[in-house]
Amino acid sequence: MATYILGVRHHGPGSARRVRERLEALRPDLILVEGPPEAEELLGQVAREGMKPPVALLAYEPTNPQNAVFYPFAAFSPEWQAMLYAATEGTELHFFDLPLIYRLTQTEVKAEETSEASPSVIGRAHV
């Protein structure tokens, strides 16, 4: 089985067209799309009646909802086109990326670094 990697520009209409064209030409057995592995069970929703982009996956910590990660998809997103192709052609589809815990932890660390590096606006304001 040959492996093909299709480089994309996120939310690029030209990239979305090329991905769709390449998938139709290659007719792969398996497609991997950048996304959280924990959300794989949602991939079946792509072809659901009434599901129209723009849509997004949202992951957040229930105890700290402002610590969130978004995965937006538009009709002109190459990722959406790959997911739609897989859904309509019956091609095996999986998300691949680091588990969400790493993304959420990164967000938390960046927030801490930012707050240490520069005081908040309220901290600098005279109230």
Where are these regions (language model features)?
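Compositional signal for N-terminal targeting/processing segments
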Residues: M1-R124
